[in-house]
Regions:
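Active-site-adjacent pocket scaffolds in enzyme catalytic domains
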Residues: 1-31, 41-46, 109-169
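Metal-dependent polysaccharide deacetylase catalytic core of the NodB/CE4 family, i.e.
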Residues: 20, 24, 38-128
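Aromatic-acidic/polar surface patches that form glycan- and anion
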Residues: 32, 36
């Protein structure tokens, strides 16, 4: 996170008298404690047990897409490191679910950072629209999508957990 976001979170913790969180945040920022939200080392250990695939959100920051800025040096280094060890795909932003140009922009950002072609996507379940999202994905060069679950039910939209080529009847 950037300075402004840390400052805002710090102020919120002070305002609500969450002194335990103020103390923890100060220790994390000064390096006295590890960041409790940085879980990539733990995921590395689990990678031998299960295939790990990362989907990266690189849209512009807004109310729905609260992500780290794509120009952050540390974030870019992390993404390069992850893409050297694991398959990496795009997690399209809320603004791109039916907007091909925005989706292409985000995919190109990830390709520029990782220096690898991006063909995989995982859309947020609540933002998936049929057939609009899939038309945008195909037009943007995305061939493999991992979104076919439901937001409010168990199961898969197509009745299968196996990959298949999406088609529009």
């Amino acid at each position: 996170k950037g300075f402004i976001r840390h400052l805002a979170a710090f102020g919120k913790n002070v305002l609500y008298l969450r002194l335990d969180l103020v103390t923890e945040r100060m220790k994390v920022l000064t390096g006295m404690l590890p960041d409790p939200y940085f879980s990539f080392d733990q995921l590395d250990k689990l990678s031998t047990l299960a295939g790990i695939r990362y989907f990266i959100l690189l849209g512009d920051y807004n109310k729905i897409d609260i992500n780290i800025h794509h120009k952050s040096k540390e974030f870019r280094q992390l993404l390069r490191s992850l893409s050297d060890r694991y398959p990496v795909g795009i997690h399209p932003s809320s603004k791109s679910s039916n907007n091909t140009l925005q989706l292409i922009k985000e995919r190109k950002r990830l390709e520029e950072i990782t220096k690898k072609p991006i063909y995989d996507s995982r859309q947020h379940f609540l933002l998936l629209t049929m057939p609009g999202t899939y038309h945008a994905l195909l037009e943007a060069g995305i061939t493999d999508d991992y979104t076919m679950g439901f937001a409010d039910n168990i199961g898969f939209r197509a009745g299968t957990a196996f990959p298949f080529y999406w088609f529009d009847l």
